[in-house]
A protein has these predicted regions:
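Metallo-beta-lactamase
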Residues: 89, 94, 99-186
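Residue-level detector of conserved, well-ordered beta-strand and adjacent loop positions
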Residues: 4-7, 19, 78, 84, ...
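Residue-level detector of beta-strand face positions
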Residues: 5, 17, 82-84, 89, ...
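Active-site HxH/HxHxD metal-binding segment of metal-dependent hydrolases
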Residues: 12, 23-26, 33-91, 166-174
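Conserved beta-strand hairpin/beta-sheet module of binuclear metal-dependent hydrolase folds
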Residues: 1-45, 104-114
Length: 186
């Protein structure tokens, strides 16, 4: 598994390329803007683009989708869906709160968290479709996942789930909230 990233657009959104180099396939995650740069990253990987995956529908994560879709097909996915990317399995976890339809994508020991989870913070819930209670449930769902994960957020620097469990007040509150609601775990 290889992860490449570039920051795109005026809000500096992280766009990721998840690759299985052995199989020669890749998935593009949150192509927020600057389609030529994004497509160049795909071309430089030498891998065949198999998926374009969006963590949510806000413009800063989707602006480059239209020009990229002119070259690649689209597919919709839902909570619990698994996508095969070479030898990798990507699992979709619905994580509403920042927006309706927000998801996190889990591949091996990696979580692509979009605007659900940031280093020491979480995504805003004051936009249309945002809901603080849903955000706490989503953060609790992530925090209660068994194991250790590297977290690649939609903005700012990567982190680890272990670190966020210890220091992120939103994850800590979400884990209590999620557990109290009787929905602990994935």
């Amino acid at each position: 598994m290889k992860i490449d990233s570039i920051m795109v657009g005026p809000i500096m959104t992280n766009c990721y390329l998840l690759s299985d180099e052995t199989a020669g396939v890749c998935a593009l995650i949150d192509p927020g803007d600057e389609a030529p740069r994004v497509l160049d990253m795909v071309a430089r990987s030498g891998c065949q683009l198999q998926y374009i995956l969006l963590t949510h529908g806000h413009f800063d994560h989707t602006t480059a989708v239209r020009p990229i879709l002119e070259q690649y097909p689209e597919r919709y996915y839902h909570d619990g869906d698994t996508l095969t990317l070479g030898s990798l399995t990507v699992t979709v976890l619905e994580t509403p709160g920042h927006s309706k339809g927000s998801v996190c994508l889990v591949a091996e020991d990696v979580i692509f968290s979009g605007d659900t989870l940031f280093r020491c913070s979480c995504g805003r819930t004051d936009f249309a479709g945002g809901d603080y209670r849903e955000m706490l449930q989503s953060l609790g769902r992530l925090g209660n996942l068994p194991g250790s994960y590297r977290v690649y957020p939609g903005h700012d620097q990567p982190t680890t789930l272990d670190y966020e469990r210890r220091v992120n007040p939103y994850v800590r509150q979400g884990m209590k909230y999620h557990g109290a609601a009787g929905h602990a775990g994935a």
